Amino acid sequence: MSFDISQFPVLAQANTPDELRQLPQAVLPQLADELRGFLLKSVGKSSGHFASGLGTVELTVALHYVYNTPFDRLVWDVGHQAYPHKILTGRRERMHTIRQKGGVHPFPWREESEYDTFSVGHSGTSISAALAMAVAAEKEQAGRKVVAVIGDGAMTGGMVFEAMNHAGDLHNDMLVVLNDNEMSISENVGALNNHLAQLMSGRFYTTIRESSKKVLKGMPVIKEMAKRTEEHLKGMVVPGTLFEELGFNYIGPIDGHDVDALVETMRNMRNLSGPQVLHIMTKKGRGYEPAEKDPIGWHAVPKFDPSTFEKPAAKPSDPTFSEVFGKWLCDIAEKDEKVLGITPAMREGSGMVEFSQRFPKQYFDAAIAEQHAVTLGAGFACEGYKPVVAIYSTFLQRGYDQMIHDVALQRLPVLFAIDRGGIVGADGPTHQGAFDLSFMRIVPNMVIMAPSDENECRQMLYTGYCYNDGPTAVRYPRGSATGAKQVETMTAMPIGKGLIKRQGKKIAILNFGTLLASSLTAAEALDATVADMRFVKPLDVELVKQLAESHDMLVTVEENAIMGGAGSGILELLQTLKLPKPVLLIGLPDEFIKHGAPDEIISELGLDATGIQKQIEDFIA
C-alpha cells in the first residue's frame, strides 16, 4: 500500500536528505506541513508511535537541512519521535509497514539505514553515544558534526547527566538538542527568546566571547567576574544554568515549530566549538487536535481514520494483566496504607492510573530512572513499608545491580510486579521481555512467580505482599489475560509449590507462565502430563522428583530465553537429585527477537500448541 504522493508536492521532492538540502529554505514550512500530513496518513494505516513524531516535524526538517547527514552523525534518544526522520531518509514508501513483521523497524536501527547511526529503544543513551562519535571525529580529523536529540522526559535519567558531565570535561564539539514537549523546564517561548538564541549563537557574539576569554586569560579575577556577569544576564531570560555548570554552552529556549528559526540557529551553532545545548519547545501531537489535547492517550495508536478525530473503540476483551495488577494494587491499598506503588514513568502502561488518583500519597513516579526506582523501594522496605515496584521486564534490566545489591543482598521485602514479560511484539528487540527469568533466577534470596492466568496473577501478587523474608517477583505478559474467572478472595500460596493440571503418560510438560493453555492442548494430542509449576524459584523439588521418576522424559515450556531460564533450573535440579532424564527445553532462542505481531512471533518460534507438539514429536522421533 502506498499513498498518492502528488498530494504532497514538496515532500515528493525530498525522499532523501540530499534532495531536501536542494530545496530553497522558503518552502520548508510547506514541507513541514506536508510531512505532518503524510505522517498522519501513514500511521493511521499502520498503527505506531504517533504524538511524539508530530511534535518533531520541524526539528527533523531543520536538522537534515543544516547538517550533512549521514556524514554528520544524528543520534536520536529512544526513537519514538523519529518517524519523520524515517520518512525523510528513504523509507517513505514503506512507512505503512512500520512495526509489522518484516516491515520498517519501530525505532532507529543501524541495520536498516545508514542515517540511523545508533540503534535505540531505551531512553538516555543518545548523549553517551554522541560523545563517543564526537571524540572519534576529532581523532580522525574528519570534520564531522555530531548531534544528539533528547526529550525532557529522558533528561530525568542519571545516565544523561553522567554523559553530560563527561562531555563538559572532554569539551569536544557536539550539539545536544533538548526537545522539551511538556513545558517541564521552561515556558519562556516567544519572539524574544528566538531572537536571543540566534543572537547568542551568531558569529559576532561568539567571536566577542572567545576573544574576551583570550584577553582575560591573564586576569583571572576579571575573567571570573565577566563569566558570572554573562551567566547572570543569560539566566535572567533562559534556564540554562544547569547546562552551563556542566560545561555546555546553552542556547534557547526557542520555538521548535518555527522551522526558519531552527535553521538559522542551527546554522550559527554548527561551527561553534565545544559542547552545546539547544533547548527547543515543542508540542506533542502538534497539528492534530485530539493528540494535542491528549498526548499520552495518542502516544501510540492502533490503525485509525485521521478524518474522524477519534481512535477506534476498543473491542470488548478480557482485562489485561496490567489491569489485573492495577485492581489488585487498589484492593490491597484499601486495607493497608503502608502499601506503596512505585513506577519509573510507566503509570499508564503498568495499570496504575486509578491507584495514583485514589491513593496519591502512596504513589511514587520515579521518572525515567529505573535504578532510583528500585533503590527507592529498598529504602521504603527498610522503614517497614510494603513497596511494590511496577516495571516492564525490559526496563528492569537497567535496575539489575540495584535489585542485587540494594534489595536481595539485604533480604528486603520488595515486590516486583514485572509487566511485559515474554514477547511484546511490535516494539521489537529492545522491548521483548526475554531475559528476566534468567537474570533473576541467579540472584540469591529471590522468589520468582510466573502466573498461568489472571487469577493466579492476583493470588501471586498477594503472596508476594505477604512474604517478608526477601524480595519477590511476579512476572506476567503484555495484553489481554486468558479469561479465567478471578477469585476476589486473596490467599497466599505455599512458596515453591506447583500443581498437576493434567495426568498423562510417559511425557511430562512442566509449564512456566501463560503458555499453559497451549501446553494443555499439545498434551491432549500426546497424552502427556502437564504441571503448572507457578514458581520459577524456588522450584517444587518434590513435584519435579515425582514427575522425573514416573515419566520417560520431561519438557519445560516458558516464554523466556532458554539459556539460564526456568528449564535450565530443572536441569540443574535433576543433576542435584542425580536423576538422569531426557529433557527438552522449549522457550526463546539465543537471539534478539524481531518485531511483529505477538501471535505471529509465538507461532514462528514454535510456542503455540502446534509448535510445542511438533517440537516434542521431533525430539522423540
Swiss-Prot record:
Pathway: Metabolic intermediate biosynthesis; 1-deoxy-D-xylulose 5-phosphate biosynthesis; 1-deoxy-D-xylulose 5-phosphate from D-glyceraldehyde 3-phosphate and pyruvate: step 1/1. Keywords: Isoprene biosynthesis, Magnesium, Metal-binding, Thiamine biosynthesis, Thiamine pyrophosphate, Transferase. Binds 1 Mg(2+) ion per subunit. Belongs to the transketolase family. DXPS subfamily. Homodimer. Catalyzes the acyloin condensation reaction between C atoms 2 and 3 of pyruvate and glyceraldehyde 3-phosphate to yield 1-deoxy-D-xylulose-5-phosphate (DXP). This is 1-deoxy-D-xylulose-5-phosphate synthase. The lineage of its organism: Bacteria, Pseudomonadati, Pseudomonadota, Gammaproteobacteria, Alteromonadales.
